[in-house]
Regions:
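Short, low-complexity, Lys/Arg-enriched N-terminal segments of secretory-pathway carbohydrate enzymes
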Residues: 1-14
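C-terminal domain-closing interface element
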Residues: 218, 222-240, 372-395
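Soluble extramembrane regions of membrane proteins in the secretory/endomembrane system
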Residues: 48-364, 765-766, 771-810
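Start-transfer (signal-anchor) and selected internal transmembrane alpha helices
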Residues: 11-33
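Cytosolic-side membrane-insertion boundary helix
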Residues: 346-382, 397-407
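Ser/Thr/Pro/Gly-rich low-complexity linker/stalk segments immediately outside membranes or between
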Residues: 41-61, 631-639
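Alpha-helical transmembrane segments of integral membrane proteins
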Residues: 3, 25-40, 377-705
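Extracytosolic and intramembrane catalytic regions of membrane-associated proteins
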Residues: 92-129, 133-139, 175-176, 257-260, ...
């Protein structure tokens, strides 16, 4: 009976493939869907509110006012910790703006307290001790008179900037947003229960000293129960929520209910916490030293200007201020009235899985719920595939073994397609790296379509197309073979989803979404018998795949927008094209994995593969032309970090064994100095890796933990003319005493110098650092922290010398011979410090597509 039915069905709906010329239209349909839906929604921003509209739109964020303040901030120029601009002018500016808010505040409803915090302290920051002296924060507490809540909501951002950068996007944008949010709260009749603390952080770029000063020492910090951290890795656009918690899923519920323009994903959180993104934020300080749970949000658009002199007012749109302001204002009002704030610990259990859909709505659920969903849809997909295969045996003359065998072949082809879909883009990245052609997409990001996406799509479809073309005639209809390809992809995704779930990765939700819509399509096809009616099942599949296609193309477009600018500052050791290739490959697999095998519905599918290969070839030719040169002046710059260094090495007897000058390069991207060689004379440039075995810290004044981590990949360009350092860094031995027992000696020092200094310590053979006046964390964990030790020191408004002592133990107790090396670096990072004439000329000789973050530095090495 079943065979009779199928014979009639096949008679009415023969399995004839469609003409080949429809295949390009099929693929172009999905491309058109991306540009018609995803691209506009990704770039959608709200209409900004003007000051003269405030009376008709009470309680709304006014972007025009925030923009005016941002322009004033921009005109002030760089704000470097230790400079008068940051420590005096900016503090006065912030206090003036805060007083303007107080002047408009509803005095009958609210109280405002303002405090300028000056603090000194230290903590372990990655591989160094991060010390600070007299750094400043401007702190405001806004509270409702009728409330007696002792649970505060903390909102943090920073106004200091990187050397050479005005910092209008990072993070002046967030500072003015906070000021306008404060104004709207203070002038509104809509009160809030929990006091709100606005922390205008004056030392974030140090790194992360102002936040530590607040959370470890400020009088209000013990009452801060939740956090909204605001930062930026770009200038303008939509801010992304990329970290939450840890735990405390109630915060995600408030974001879902309050955020008018949601933009968030669990995947971003896991990528950031894995260290793939070369950045850090104050969120970690509040999390680790509070601990204060919260939400970490950052601007991400136009990361090309981040930490450069082109981070200016003119690249930030007013509507981007409106977007962030509306989200922040609504979120603050929601959390400011949250019942959970009374006892946050009672609501702390469980991580969240969270994401937005095209910025239209936000989804979150508990990690435990996510585990259940992932397992259910993973197993459900496998079960439905088994039902479909059984159904095929009922409508053909084949037994279950034959159908299972055919499906087994399809599954092997699926594994091959996955390997190719990942492998071909990665292979492209490797080839381009071998030819010194990395970052060709850096300015013209559309090049990734031909370089990485098309090869991935070819990999997805090639094994199946070859099999369908070359296989002998089979009793299994072609339409069933195509369904088996989708089934194989479903089973593969189900296995991956379950494995990632077991591994504790919440990003497994991506595979669950893909399975959800395929399971839906398969259910419809089974219940309606469309799977047995020629190719009609593919229409249901395409309709059900529209939603996941939109989501995955939106998500991975967002990741490319965020990550492509970061490839120019990921360092020299890792090929950045690998990251972009993997993102393109994973996005292609998830967005198109069920769709592109359907080109085999059309005749001559190998022509479609040839067309994709031709597109790849054309894009390759374009990429090796001038179009593929990564850098452009002002908009897509090459970052070159270098110091103008004067070095002096003292031996144990006080003699000088080395005194020289040169340029110390901490190169930021994979192309090294090659793009500069046409304009700059690099004769004598040496790789420092060879010096690292002979000299402590490779003999250079690496700035912070990132510079020190990359020191073996650094370059040194000797200079005949001595570098003129605009100041003096002095280390003075105050006293040397032998302690009781005779095997330990104490050395007491005084260090004087600029606002940024580093101390490097290396005990010699047979000597152990027993104690010191710094934090003991390094000494208490010798398995983690090994010599040479790095102590980073910065001061804000107090340049007083620091005094410290070192206690060293020696096996033979002989302290009349060399015991340890100590290196002292002084960094004059501010733009107000004068560069000598040769350095100025060197900077001017750099190509116009270069942004140089540079400053003079001294490095003195002593042996005691």
């Amino acid at each position: 009976m079943d065979n009779t039915i199928i014979e009639l069905i096949e008679k009415d709906h023969p399995k004839k493939q469609l003409p080949w010329y429809y295949a390009p239209s099929f693929l172009l349909l999905w491309v058109a869907l991306f540009f018609a839906v995803v691209f506009p929604l990704f770039n959608s921003l709200p209409t900004p509110v003007k000051i003269d509209e405030e009376t008709t739109k009470p309680g709304q964020f006014v972007a025009e006012r925030a923009q005016y303040i941002l322009l004033e901030l921009d005109r002030l120029g760089p704000k470097i910790v230790g400079d008068e601009m940051n420590e005096k002018t900016m503090v006065e500016f912030m206090l003036r703006e805060i007083e303007a808010v107080r002047g408009d505040m509803r005095q009958d409803l609210y109280d405002m307290e303002v405090d300028v915090q000056r603090a000194s302290g230290a903590y372990l920051h990655w591989e160094m001790i991060n010390m600070y002296q007299a750094v400043q924060n401007v702190v405001v507490k806004l509270s409702t008179k009728s409330s007696n809540s002792t649970s505060y909501l903390l909102i943090n951002s920073h106004y200091d900037t990187k050397p050479g950068s005005v910092g209008t996007g990072d993070a002046g944008f967030m500072v003015v947003t906070m000021l306008e949010v404060m104004r709207q709260l203070a002038t509104s009749e809509q009160t809030f229960e929990h006091p709100i603390v606005f922390l205008f952080n004056g030392a974030e770029e140090q790194p992360l000293q102002g936040s530590h000063a607040f959370i470890s020492q400020h009088k209000w910090s013990p009452n801060c129960k939740a956090l909204i951290n605001l930062d930026s890795a770009g200038a303008g656009g939509r801010e992304i929520l990329f970290q939450g918690g840890p735990n405390h899923p109630w915060l995600m519920r408030h974001y879902r209910d309050a955020a008018k323009h949601p933009f968030a994903t669990t995947m971003a959180e896991e990528v950031f916490q894995a260290g793939i993104i070369p950045s850090d934020t104050d969120f970690r300080i509040f999390r680790d030293f509070g601990p204060v749970p919260g939400l970490d949000m950052a601007g991400q658009y136009n990361g090309f200007v981040y930490h450069t002199k082109y981070d200016r007012f003119d690249v930030i749109s007013r509507d981007s201020l409106q977007n962030t302001g509306e989200n922040l204002l609504s979120l603050v009002r929601s959390i400011g009235n949250a019942e959970e704030m009374h006892d946050t610990k009672a609501h702390s259990e469980g991580h969240s899985v969270f994401f937005d859909f095209l910025g239209l709505f936000f989804v979150y659920y508990l990690e435990s719920t996510g585990i259940a969903l992932n397992i259910c849809f993973g197993l459900g997909g496998i079960i439905l595939v088994c039902v479909s295969l059984w159904r095929m045996t009922r409508t053909t003359e084949l037994d279950i073994g034959s159908v299972s065998g055919a499906f087994g072949i399809m599954f092997l082809l699926e594994l091959a397609s996955f390997v190719l879909a990942l492998g071909l883009p990665v292979l492209m990245a490797v080839f381009y790296d071998a030819g010194d052609r990395t970052l060709t997409y850096f300015t013209n990001s559309w090049l990734v379509i031909g370089l990485f996406i098309c090869p991935s799509v070819i990999g997805l479809v090639l094994p199946f197309t070859l099999y369908y073309t070359l296989r002998p005639s089979s009793k299994i209809p072609h339409t069933y073979h195509l369904q088996m390809a989708g089934h194989a992809h479903c089973v593969f995704l189900a296995i991956v989803c379950i494995i990632l779930t077991i591994a504790g990765l919440r990003s497994a939700y991506l595979f669950m979404i893909s399975l959800l819509f395929y399971v839906g399509a398969l259910t419809i096809n089974l219940l309606s018998s469309l799977q047995d009616r020629g190719y009609f099942w593919s229409l249901v599949l395409c309709a059900c795949q529209a939603m996941p296609f939109l989501y995955f193309s939106y998500l991975f477009h967002a990741f490319l927008v965020i990550c492509i600018p970061m490839t120019a500052r990921k360092g020299t050791e890792v090929n950045p094209d690998l990251l972009i290739a993997l993102l393109c490959a994973l996005g292609s697999i998830l967005a198109l994995g069920f769709l592109v095998p359907l080109i085999n519905i059309f005749r001559r599918p190998n022509c479609m593969i040839g067309g994709l290969a031709l597109i790849t070839f054309i894009f390759c030719m374009i990429s090796v032309s001038e179009v593929g040169f990564p850098y452009r002046p002002k908009t897509n710059v090459m970052r070159v970090n270098f110091l103008q260094v004067h070095r002096k090495f003292y031996e144990y007897d006080g003699s000088v064994s080395l005194e020289d000058s040169g340029y110390y390069f901490d190169l930021q991207d994979r192309r090294l100095e090659l793009p500069l060689r046409d304009k700059v004379d690099f004769d004598g440039l040496v790789h420092l890796e060879g010096e690292c075995d002979a000299q402590m810290m490779c003999g250079v004044p690496c700035f912070n933990h990132r510079w020190c981590e990359a020191r073996t990949a650094a370059r040194w360009l000797p200079r005949k003319e001595p570098v003129e350092v605009p100041g003096t860094t002095t280390l003075e031995l105050l006293n040397k005493t032998t302690l009781a027992g005779g095997y330990t000696a104490r050395y007491q020092f005084k260090l004087t110098g600029p606002a940024r200094m580093s101390i490097f310590l290396k005990p010699l053979s047979g000597v152990k650092m027993q104690d010191w006046s710094f934090l003991r964390g390094m000494l208490d964990n010798p398995g983690t922290y090994k010599p040479p030790y790095h102590i980073f020191f910065a001061w804000g408004v107090d340049s007083s010398p620091i005094e410290f002592h070192l206690d060293l133990t020696k096996v033979n107790g002989n302290f009349l011979e060399p015991v340890f090396e100590i290196g002292i670096s002084g960094h004059y990072i501010s733009h107000v410090h004068k560069r000598d004439a040769y350095s100025v000329q060197f900077i001017e000789d750099l190509p116009d597509f270069v942004h140089a973050m540079e400053w003079p530095a001294s490095y003195d090495r002593y042996i005691y």
